[in-house]
Each structure stands twice: as structure tokens, then as C-alpha cells.
Design a protein with these regions (language model features):
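Substrate-binding/active-site clefts of carbohydrate-active enzymes
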Residues: 1-71
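A short, structured beta-strand-centered segment in the mid-to-C-terminal lobe
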Residues: 20-21, 25-28, 230-241
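Active-site beta-strand/loop architecture of penicillin-binding DD-peptidases
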Residues: 225
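Catalytic cores of secreted or luminal carbohydrate-active enzymes
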Residues: 233-258
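A structural detector for beta-sheet-dominated domains
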Residues: 228-230, 306
């Protein structure tokens, strides 16, 4: 045998993503070993597995599994083994699934025919909310359904709400940059309301660095955060708001105990599209919290919450 230049570990695929041959023992050993090395030597707390679709599905009109379907059974089997291995050898280690793969029970235990991941990124929530934020007052009314859409599938998985680098870095505008249609102080006020909504919404929170104090320009690869903005009161106040919301979250079990339970969340008002106001309850065994968020630039001294 000799090396002829052909791929040993991955399939030849289109695009810039190499699809590993997950059924091969040497491939599994290579990937498992890399994960353990990163965890043990660099003390990482978890990994986000991106482009899950490439591992779980064959590309259109290419391979088929032994049953004639498009599912990559070797890929699914590998991900299950990965979760079992990680949770056994690396206590507390987090596996977070990302990508648009339509695969059920990603965060269900392997014994229940799931993939065994801890969380899945709710990219639909992020895309919808960024679209909503970027619209003017009339556009927000048209997109009002984005505020409640995630509830249609919220309890099918354990979700992370990913306002991450994927949507907010380099070529993508920051949260502040998406609000360019508003005067500066109104942008700050809208972000305070948005941060409050995300904090109270079911799902774990992921906010890309710099957004918490209102970065104006996207963070470039190899660049650094523009901490000089904290010399300005409005940016310091936004950072203080983010800090206060994090503390409030930790102090109130209603904001996290019922993330995966339909009893932990109830909409009281998800029909005030003209006012761009949404109202809901978060529940826990020890408390109930009433949450009202006004995304408009209008003050409502009297408002029917129900």
C-alpha cells in the first residue's frame, strides 16, 4: 500500500467543508482524540458543532444510505458516540449543535434515540429577531409575529438563543448598526428593551462580545473590542443594563427553570402589533414573573396587558 494523494479522512465534497468518513474507526479516533486534547490541555468548557447538516445528510443527488434514504447514518452514529464519550470522560462538558439540519431529538438522550447534545442553537430566533430589530416602526408591525414565532417549536429541543459572531461580526452589522434608522439615544433605548426581552425569553443566552455596550462597527478578525466607547455615558449605561439583567436572571428561577416546559411560559398579549408591545408570564415553583416589553418609540401610560 502507498499514499496516492487521495483523501484518507474525508469525502470529496463541494464548498469548503470536508465531510469526514464517519464510519471509519481511524476517523472516529482522530476526532475523539482532538476533542479530548482540547478539553484536557486547553480547558475548554464545550464545543459548538457547526454545519450539522453535512454530517447528518448526504448532499442532494449524491450518496444514499443502505436503505435508500438521504440520511448519513454513519454521521448520526458518530455524533451519538461523541456525546456519550464526552459526557462520560469530560463531566460538565457542553455539546452545542448548530446548523440548519432538520433532525429530531438533537438534545434528547441517546437512550431515547436522540443525538445526546446538551443544547441546539435556535438560529430561527436569531434571524427573526435581527430582521425585526432592523425594521422601522411600520416594518416592525409587519414583522410582529417574529416575537412569538419561536414558541411554535421552543419545547422540541433545549435551545440557545445565539446572537453570535456568525450574525454580528466582520461583514455583518452590529446590533447598533442595524438600528441606523433611529436617533442615537433611541437606539440605546431599543437595545435595552431587546436585551430585556432576550433575558426573559426561554432559552440560554449567547451575546457576541461588544454588543453589551453597543459596539458601532463590526469586530474584524484579529481585531479588538472598541472599549473607548465606554468613555461615553450612553455606552456605559447600556453595559450597566446588561450587567443588571444578568444578575436579575440569576436571582429569578422563573427565567430559567421552565425553559424546556410549556408550563414555564404563557403569552398574555402577542397581538398588539400596532403598538409593538408583547406581554408574557414566566413561571417557576417559587415565583411568577410578568414581563412586558415595548419595542416602539411611543410611551403608553395606560396599556391593557391581557
Amino acid at each position: 500500500d502507498y499514499f496516492d494523494g487521495s483523501t484518507l479522512y474525508e469525502e470529496n465534497g463541494s464548498g469548503d467543508t470536508a465531510v469526514f468518513r464517519f464510519g471509519r474507526a481511524e476517523v472516529q479516533s482522530f476526532l475523539f482524540s482532538n476533542l479530548c486534547f482540547l478539553a484536557n490541555e486547553f480547558h475548554i468548557d464545550g464545543v459548538r458543532v457547526i454545519d450539522m447538516a453535512s454530517a447528518l445528510w448526504y448532499r442532494a443527488n449524491e450518496n444514499r444510505n443502505c436503505y435508500g434514504g438521504g440520511e448519513n447514518l454513519d454521521g448520526a452514529s458518530f455524533l451519538r458516540r461523541l456525546s456519550l464519550m464526552a459526557h462520560k470522560k469530560l463531566p460538565g462538558f457542553l455539546l452545542i449543535a448548530d446548523g440548519s439540519a432538520e433532525w429530531p431529538r438533537t438534545t434528547e438522550p441517546v437512550k431515547n434515540d436522540g443525538l445526546g447534545f446538551d443544547f441546539r442553537c435556535n438560529q430561527g430566533f436569531a434571524d427573526g429577531m435581527l430582521s425585526y430589530l432592523g425594521a422601522d416602526e411600520a416594518g416592525k408591525s409587519e414583522r410582529y409575529g417574529e416575537l412569538s414565532y419561536a414558541q411554535l417549536y421552543q419545547y422540541s429541543e433545549q435551545y440557545v438563543l445565539p446572537l453570535s459572531h456568525t450574525a454580528l461580526s466582520e461583514r455583518q452589522p452590529t446590533l447598533m448598526g442595524r438600528l441606523g434608522y433611529l436617533p442615537f439615544e433611541e437606539r440605546i433605548a431599543l437595545l435595552r428593551a431587546f436585551f430585556g426581552f432576550v433575558t426573559a425569553h426561554p432559552g440560554k443566552k449567547l451575546l457576541f462580545a461588544g454588543q453589551e455596550f453597543g459596539m458601532l462597527e463590526p469586530l474584524q478578525l484579529g481585531g479588538e473590542l472598541d472599549f473607548s466607547l465606554l468613555d461615553f455615558p450612553s455606552h456605559r449605561e447600556l453595559q450597566a443594563c446588561s450587567e443588571a439583567l444578568n444578575a436579575f436572571y440569576l436571582e429569578h428561577p422563573a427565567l430559567y427553570e421552565g425553559d424546556g416546559d410549556t408550563e414555564g411560559f404563557t403569552f398574555l398579549n402577542c397581538h398588539s402589533y400596532e403598538e409593538n408591545v408583547v406581554v408574557f408570564l414566566r413561571r417557576a415553583t417559587s415565583e411568577d414573573l410578568l414581563v412586558a416589553v415595548n419595542f416602539s418609540g411611543t410611551s403608553y401610560p395606560r396599556f391593557n396587558l391581557g
